[in-house]
A protein has these predicted regions:
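Generic structural hydrophobic/aromatic packing signal, biased to beta-strands
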Residues: 9-11, 32, 71, 89, ...
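C-terminal charged capping/lid subdomain of soluble metabolic enzymes
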Residues: 33, 44, 147-220
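A glycine/threonine-rich phosphate-anchoring loop and its flanking beta-alpha core
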Residues: 1-63
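Phosphate-rich cofactor/ligand-interacting catalytic cores and adjacent structured alpha/beta frameworks
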Residues: 34-45, 52-80, 208-220
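Active-site segments that bind and position negatively charged phosphate/pyrophosphate groups
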Residues: 54-161
Length: 220
């Protein structure tokens, strides 16, 4: 088909609203990941391990976090999947893509440990997923690893009927355990950018914490 640059993108809200909510809710994963991406970037910066081409940029990081704030603030609109809720997700995706290439193909402010977890999970299980489910599970994991699981995120998930437990993805906790045990080596073997996962050493404590949070969200 060759190379083409779209001149415009049209959004049909009615078509989006008619889709199963699990697909639309899935879009939150690729906004929440801005938060854990920035945490990983800050983690690398504090240890002088940022790539020379992707040095920590506080202005870019701050701008990225604003989209997370806006997403969380629009929980009711997202829950109802009205136009304002859809826009809060689309705006973040649009900015994320644009800022990726405009900052020198820098993924630091939009992706980190949450996606690395997902990539390894997909690699080990050889399964395909609704993207937002494993990413949101990885987001909770990343927040726990950074000790930054804020209450606003728990409340956000409580208000959405979006199940991203292993069972909802036809997995079990053994799959998650295996993913965690091999996470560090996966990151290193695939030359993924340095973050908290690069230093991660598996312990049952992190699994217990993750399972506890997911079990609580399932019971809401």
């Amino acid at each position: 088909m060759g190379w083409a640059v779209p001149e415009s993108v049209f959004i049909d809200y009615e078509i989006i609203q008619s889709a199963p909510k699990i697909f639309n809710y899935s879009g939150i994963g690729d906004v929440l990941c801005f938060f854990t991406g920035v945490l990983d970037w800050q983690y690398a910066d504090k240890r002088n391990k940022c790539e020379s081409k992707w040095k920590y940029d506080p202005k870019l990081a701050s701008e990225s976090l604003k989209y997370v704030d806006e997403l969380v603030a629009n929980i009711e609109n997202i829950k109802n999947m009205n136009e304002k809720g859809i826009q809060s997700i689309i705006k973040a995706h649009q900015w994320g893509g644009n800022s990726f290439f405009s900052s020198g193909w820098n993924p630091r402010h939009i992706e980190g440990i949450e996606h690395f977890f997902f990539y390894n999970l997909e690699f080990l299980t050889n399964k395909k997923f609704i993207h937002g489910q494993p990413v949101c599970l990885g987001f909770i994991l990343g927040c726990l690893m950074h000790n930054k699981l804020e209450e606003r995120f728990i409340e956000f998930f409580k208000n959405l009927d979006f199940n991203f437990s292993p069972e909802a993805m036809n997995l079990n906790w053994d799959d998650v355990t295996n993913t965690l045990k091999t996470l560090r080596s996966y990151i290193q073997k695939n030359n993924l950018w340095y973050g908290i996962g690069s230093d991660f050493e598996y312990s049952s404590e992190i699994l217990i914490q993750l399972k506890d949070i997911i079990d609580k969200l399932k019971k809401i």
